């Protein structure tokens, strides 16, 4: 088991449709730590840390569009080294 952290920016109809709440639920189900945060440009920023296979499952879920009410047009991901220790998976404002 190797642990990784990624940061992702999800673009499309992803705000006001419960996207960050369902992302939190999915990340918790996968045993990941991190957060989801609405950004000023209409995207959602997601930081996810944990087992590499579980992080990949979250990325796949994000690419597939998350909740039914959302529409994902584009997702960008890159490795990430959080400055703080992340516990649990939260929604940030």
From Swiss-Prot:
InterPro entries named in the record: Acylphosphatase, Acylphosphatase-like_dom, Acylphosphatase-like_dom_sf, Acylphosphatase_bac, Acylphosphatase_CS
Alphabetic keyword roster: Disulfide bond, Hydrolase
Location of the active site: 38
UniProt key word Hydrolase: yes
Pfam families in alphabetical order: Acylphosphatase
Keyword Disulfide bond included in the entry's annotation: yes
Enzyme nomenclature, EC number: 3.6.1.7
Catalytic activity: an acyl phosphate + H2O = a carboxylate + phosphate + H(+)
An MF annotation (GO) of this entry: acylphosphatase activity
Domain Acylphosphatase-like: 5-93
Protein name according to UniProt: Acylphosphatase
Biological source species: Salmonella paratyphi A (strain ATCC 9150 / SARB42)
Gene that this sequence comes from: yccX
């Amino acid at each position: 088991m190797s642990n990784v952290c990624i940061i992702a920016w999800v673009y499309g109809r992803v705000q006001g449709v419960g996207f960050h709440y369902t992302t939190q639920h999915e990340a918790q189900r996968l045993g990941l730590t991190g957060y989801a945060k609405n950004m000023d440009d209409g995207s959602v920023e997601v930081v996810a840390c944990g087992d590499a296979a579980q992080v990949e499952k979250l990325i796949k879920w994000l690419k597939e569009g998350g909740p039914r009410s959302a529409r994902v047009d584009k997702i960008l991901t890159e490795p990430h080294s959080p400055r703080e220790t992340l516990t649990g998976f939260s929604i940030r404002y």
